[in-house]
Amino acid sequence: MNIILKCPVDSATAPALSRKRPLVLAPFLGQTVLEHALTSLAAEGVKHVCIEASDRVEEIRNVVGRGEAWGIKIEFSRAAGTQADFSPARIITLDRLPQLPQQPLWRSYRDWYAAQQALIPALARQRVGMREAAPGVFVSLRSQVAGDARLLGPCWVGANVFVGPRATVGPGTIIEDGSYIDGGAEVTGSVVGPQTYVGAFTELRDSFAWGNELLHLDTGSLTEVADRFLLGELQRQAGLAGGLRDAVRFLRKKAPVKSAETNSRQIAAPRTRLEPLLGN
């Protein structure tokens, strides 16, 4: 079966999702929207996909290659339908996922968020190394969660993630691969993008945080956070140990603890709530 898969260039109602990468490469439960779509098509028996894309095509090509990961053949074209030797059974526009055809993706930031919430259980079952640690709480075996951290379902904690002591993740929260949620932080109703540091005693609500960018899911307000102690981008690491932890330790050394008594009082330290500035 042949498929033409059209990739939207951007979204007038959710423009921030295409700031860092092409829209179809927006983070989505451990992979990208495009990768999840290809997984579904391969499961249907599709053997040949022609991707019609015009925005940062090389980035898309670097992610999906020639389709080897799905056992399908992938080609690229700016106008796939003009190929004489390609007779598609279907033409699909990637404005919703095949796994959830009733849910639009790009109509608003809330649509993108809602699609992920709806698919957490199904995609967790498909991903190697994910386990259900408690009802609705899905955690990668390659992540580390402090014993006194609180995970409240529904939530997703991806691979190579660190969740620090007394941190709270959930409900309604997704932590993407390679992120670091420092001690005492609280992330509720939000998405934390890949390789993102959320500082100690920082509070995120109803937001999408990726690197130092903070987006409110309802208002669409976008802010770049200058204080890397609160929110920042981490370099991609091969695993949880090593450079990721070293970078966070370096940040902590900038504010040394004065005494054991001071350290003990930090348990009740007030949180810093991060909110995008209105009007951006």
Question: Language-model features: where?
Answer:
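N-terminal glycine-rich phosphate-binding loop and ensuing alpha1 helix
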Residues: 1-60, 72
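Short, well-ordered coil/turn residues that connect adjacent beta-strands
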Residues: 30, 135, 141-142, 147, ...
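Conserved beta-loop-beta/alpha segment of the NTase-like Rossmann-fold superfamily
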Residues: 44, 58-104
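Residue-level signal for well-ordered alpha-helical positions
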Residues: 63, 118-119, 193
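Extended, small-residue-rich solenoid/repeat segments and analogous flexible loops
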Residues: 96-173
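Glycine-rich hexapeptide-repeat left-handed beta-helix
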Residues: 180-280
